[in-house]
Amino acid sequence: MALHLHRAERTDLLADGLAALLSDPLPDPFATELVLVPAKGVERWLSQRLSNRLGVCAAVEFRNPRSLIAELTGTADDDPWSPDAMVWPLLGVIDESLDEPWCATLATHLGHFEMGEEYELRQGRRYAVARRLAGLFASYARQRPQLLVDWDGLPDDLAWQKALWQALCERIDADPPHIRHAKTLVQLHESPTDLPQRLSLFGHTRLPATEVELLTALATHHDLHLWLPHPSDTLWQALSTRKGPLPRREDTSHRDVGHPLLATLGRDLREMQRLLPEPDTDEFRGRSEYPDTLLGWLQSDIAADAVRPQGRHHRREDRSIQVHSCHGPSRQIDVLREVLLGLLADDPTLEPRDILVMCPDIETYAPLITAGFGLGDVVPRTRGAHINLSAHPAHKLRVRLADRALVQTNPLLAVAAQLLALAGGRATASEVLNLAESAPVRARFGFTDDDLDAITAWTREANIRWGFDQEHRRPYGVEFLHNTWRFGIDRVLAGVAMSDDSHAWLGTTLPLDDVSSNRVELAGRFADFVEKLRRTVDQLSGTRPLHEWLDALTAGIDALALADEDWPAAQMQREFAEITARAGDTATSLRLADVRALLDRHLAGRPTRANFRTGTLTVCTMVPMRSVPHRVVCLVGLDDGVFPRLGAVDGDDALARDPMTGERDIRSEDRQLLLDAILAATQTLVITYTGANEYSGQARPPAVPLAELIDTLKITTEDSALDVLTRHPLQPFDKRNVIPGALVPDEPFTFDQTALVAARASSGERAMRPAFFSDPLPPPLPDDVALEDLLNFFKDPVKGFFRALDYTLPWDVEGVSDVMPVDIDALEEWTVGDRMLSDILRGMTPAAAQQAEWRRGTLPPGQLGWRRAIALRDQCALLAAEALGFRDTDGQAYDVDIDLGGGRRLTGTVSPVFGDRLVSVTYSKLGGKHLLQSWIPLLALAAGYPDRDWLAVCIGRPARGTTPRVEGLGGPDNPVDLLADLVAIYDAGRREPLPLPVKTSYAWAEARHCGDDPEQKAGFRWRSGRYPGEDAEPAHVRAWGRDAWLRDLMQPLRPGEEFEGETHRLGAYSSRLWLPLLRAERPVR
């Protein structure tokens, strides 16, 4: 028999040659043809290609070379020397050898001589280190087996590997791989195997030395056909005399290469040629014609191993090679879909099946691709009889994503990953809530969107931060219950039975307010979820054998998650069973970090045959579809620092110290993948990369191999100014995207109608932003006015306008915090103080109010929080004592019904009133807005009951110190007139935003009242500086724009708004509102 070598520039030519070979049947009609392929994607494409050429592809078995090697060496069912099997006995050897002198280096790395936390941390590396060493030993056996025989040339700092390997060989009851390899070679030379008479090895660009030796030996009694994609027969012939491995540093073959891309990207092919034995036959299947395009010229130059620019002039419409510089990954996908739509529109014969998209980092781009393509059912093209402008045409393109990690595709395995992360962490509020929001957990506990909103609110209000309970916190040196899940859940459950107003608590548990009766069942489900999660995390701790870890993880998933289909559970059980089978009956104990490392590796992305060539647009990593011809090949994400992969040299890898030709180098492998992609494109090659930072706009260079491609294209033609690079703007609605010829020749770049509308808007004539309101709304009907509505309006007149329109202003989203409070800011201090003051006024003692606040978990922990609570308690006690001094009678309620004239009335109830006094108290520093909230009810009492001498007493904190500030307001002589004027302001404020911000207008009127400069005082309150001013309030920003000046509020007076001494609306409205109040101030003692 013989070794037959078939070479071609593209794999479709090789496939046609393989079809011709298979058309000549074997003597045995029942014999199966065996074809070895490098990846699942190649297998799918090749089977379809053979079916197309032969009419049917049957009795052909596709396998990868490793499965054939396993069959030849008798390890098809179980290979004890595979890295995943070898790791378990290796772990045992390492554990038993840590005290040996030769193992000191490894023992130090694993913390054998450490104590406490450092010991636990380093011991968590055990599996990861053992698996890495198992991979190194397997690499030695596959690429340089002689090293395992004599360990010749091993550096002194790696001498421990020899002793470790020898101990491992004694532990495993099987021939070591180098001995097994030698025996297999002898057997193959002596006699034929049970394999088919004819075998084919298709599409490989790199084979380890041992596999080449085995295949060569196999060719002794079998016909072995090696179908090798090689870009240049000229280069092959030039290097044909260079044979045999040698140190890579001594390889000078690149000097004999004529084309720069073959020199920089084709090292893997050159080194493979050195390893191959002399074939019995050598066939080259070349192409006679190339497209008259830039891509065709490049491919023909590569085939000729020469740069031949003579007579070539690049045509502007030639877009056969496109390189797109974008602002980040998201923008790359935007550009990609526009490019693909353009290609599909220009060529009606082009179909999605003819397009291949490859990217080095599939997990980064997968969600972006899912959002950018294939949403036709989610984003309909039409809305009723109208075109939906938000629907991008690319949403009609169906996309198939391959190579995804199992934790991304299987929801139960995603839950497993979350559980392992929680088990080794602090169980923060956000982590637990994220788990609760996952689909399987929602299904198990019946959580709806409203339920999750309520649970999030409970978590926030109960001040849950991290840790399940005191025991869970103990490893962190924190053993108090506050801010734990146990603390918060107890508050929620207690809130089911009693409210916060009951002034009662159970031990350290203060009932949570607002747990309504219709949420009782949800509170139970929430508590059940947290309790089951706590038990699962407890089980996922300590040290135990692998099967116990997997049993505990399975039990936790069963308790917490429920898939809506059967396949996720079946796949999870299959994956766990495979892990257990590889480990065998090992009793080696593992830690949580070991199990994480194990599952992270096992559940990583892997290609499956069903994800390729399904008629849709295929998206995958760079490996599965390498060398497979497509009319359009797109490479996405060729960013500097991402491609080629940054493979840091493993300091323990003896091969990396002095690599030989033919040994694996992932950066060289990635360069070869780029060369394969260039040759696989038959019509168009599209490449995108991040050429500018999406936040700062700072320019970023392309990946080095991509830069080499761009430089080579510049010398492929006589056009020295050739530039295939398109630099895209940051935004998809930039006008360059829609102007014909701005980015691509003669036509607009984008197909997005929304981008066109936005571009037109953004490129229109620039003008000053129009005022939010140019004219007031029609006046409201002169209905009666409720006192409560009047009070609410004057809390913030500008916001009152938006409230009247049911207009929602921007607000800060209240999320949960994972940080335990060690201090409280001013707003939090006010919240706590106001609550304690209210408790004291409702009858609680200051000490009891302090105890209740401590049980809420809002204060810092331990003595720090207790001291803070004492300070707040004392301040609240002073305020309450001052208020109770004026509340010397029981509070009464007074109904008011006041005729304002013109058929309108002001109605409502004023309470509580203590004798002739309205007494209000606030924890805030007493200011104008607090006085105003007492002034309006005082006017109502004075107007409704004019025969009494009413007084409003306002109490609050002072600007400095602790002594409460007390202000008094006496009843005016004309309360009805003043109320009518307030109602007039109220009517005007519902028609337009009035220039009446509360603090600013009070400062203006106070300065006017005291004879100071009103504009200076008001500007201090309005303009933001060290602290936010009223110009930053959302309502004011919406009404007058961001960073509005005080003069923007000083608008000309309108008829009926005049006020003595004021020349603009801010001054007039400020004086109308505040001067009567300021004139009514009087001492209360």
UniProtKB/Swiss-Prot annotation:
Domain of life according to the entry: Bacteria
Loss of function: phenotype: Unlike E.coli, triple recB-recC-recD deletion is no more sensitive to DNA damaging agents (UV light sensitivity, mitomycin C, methyl methanesulphonate or ionizing radiation) than wild-type; has reduced resistance to H(2)O(2) which is exacerbated by further adnA-adnB deletion. Triple mutants have no effect on homologous recombination or on NHEJ of blunt-end, 5'- or 3'-overhang DSBs or on incompatible 3'-chromosomal overhangs. However the triple mutant disrupts all single-strand annealing repair of DSB.
GO CC entries: exodeoxyribonuclease V complex
The UniProt record lists the keyword DNA-binding: yes
UniProt record, GO biological process: double-strand break repair via homologous recombination
UniProt cross-references to InterPro entries, sorted A to Z: DExx_box_DNA_helicase_dom_sf, P-loop_NTPase, RecC, RecC_C, Restrct_endonuc-II-like
Keywords (A to Z) from UniProt: ATP-binding, DNA damage, DNA repair, DNA-binding, Exonuclease, Helicase, Hydrolase, Nuclease, Nucleotide-binding
Pfam families per the UniProt record, alphabetical: Exonuc_V_gamma, RecC_C
Molecular functions (GO terms): ATP binding; DNA binding; DNA helicase activity; exodeoxyribonuclease V activity
Miscellaneous information on this protein: In the RecBCD complex, RecB has a slow 3'-5' helicase, an exonuclease activity and loads RecA onto ssDNA, RecD has a fast 5'-3' helicase activity, while RecC stimulates the ATPase and processivity of the RecB helicase and contributes to recognition of the Chi site.
Function (record text): A helicase/nuclease that prepares dsDNA breaks (DSB) for recombinational DNA repair. Binds to DSBs and unwinds DNA via a highly rapid and processive ATP-dependent bidirectional helicase activity. Holoenzyme degrades any linearized DNA that is unable to undergo homologous recombination. In the holoenzyme this subunit recognizes the wild-type Chi sequence, and when added to isolated RecB increases its ATP-dependent helicase processivity. Unlike the case in E.coli, suppresses RecA-dependent homologous recombination, is instead required for single-strand annealing pathway repair of DSB.
Quaternary structure annotation from Swiss-Prot or TrEMBL: Heterotrimer of RecB, RecC and RecD. All subunits contribute to DNA-binding.
Family: Belongs to the RecC family.
Name the record gives this protein: RecBCD enzyme subunit RecC
Organism encoding this protein: Mycolicibacterium smegmatis (strain ATCC 700084 / mc(2)155)
Gene: recC
